[in-house]
A protein has these predicted regions:
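Conserved N-terminal beta1-alpha1 strand-loop-helix module at the mouth
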Residues: 1-88, 96-124, 140-146, 150-159, ...
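A short, flexible beta-alpha/helix-coil linker loop
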Residues: 131-133
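Glycine/threonine-rich flexible loop motifs
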Residues: 135-137
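C-terminal binding/interaction regions
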Residues: 176, 180-183
Length: 205
């Protein structure tokens, strides 16, 4: 079974205008050992250029590197895997593009979706939003820690909790059953993203 670092750091500049590669470097400097590249809107050339810049940084630091939504770009840059949304390609199709030995994770928002993703062979399921988030244009209703507990009861694969998680709430989310906590805004909007990573890791190990 896949072993995930406790912090799942998402590289998305949001409204900061920080270059993705610079953000990635800062997160890695703080101790992040898993990065997912997420750009909205996902313009292909921009996503490819950012992925090409970040993958060597991640691998030099001994970190896993995933690309959001796009298994083709993940394959092109030899990323460690891809993260799929509910409207993206099925797990099996993504695996055909990526080849063997790559990670495929899936976003889920309820127990049924999580069970379906695990049954389809996802290496991990992301569940959320746990808390209110400002990182999505049209956020769903927060589901709270109960969603983590419920999904933990029906899947054997690792669970990544996402949505409005902060350094203060991350330990609670882990205690509810999440193997990892995914964070965007609390890291990339911080004045010092590296320090923000260190603060999170100090609480969750």
């Amino acid at each position: 079974m896949l072993g995930l670092p406790a912090l799942y750091a998402i590289v998305d500049p949001l409204d900061t205008r920080r270059p993705p590669a610079a953000l990635a470097a800062a997160l890695l400097a703080g101790g992040a050992r898993l990065l997912q590249l997420r750009l909205k809107p996902p313009i292909s050339r921009e996503l490819l250029a950012a992925a090409e810049a970040i993958r060597p940084l991640a691998h030099a630091a001994g970190a896993l590197f995933l690309v959001n939504d796009r298994p083709d770009i993940a394959h092109a840059v030899e990323a460690d895997g891809v993260h799929l949304g509910q409207e993206d390609l099925p797990v099996a199709a993504a695996r055909r593009i990526l080849g063997r030995g790559r990670i495929v994770g899936v976003s889920t928002h309820d127990v049924d979706q999580a069970r379906a993703a695990a049954t389809a062979g996802a290496d991990y399921v992301a569940v959320g939003p746990i808390y209110a988030t400002t990182s999505k244009e049209h956020p769903l209703t927060p589901r709270g820690l109960e969603l983590v507990r419920a999904v933990r009861g029906v899947v054997a694969c690792p669970i990544v909790a996402i949505g409005g998680i902060t350094a203060e709430t991350a330990p609670l989310v882990r205690a509810a059953g999440a193997d990892a906590v995914a964070m965007i805004g609390a890291l990339v909007r911080a004045a010092d993203p590296a320090a923000a990573v260190r603060a999170v890791l100090a609480g969750i190990g």
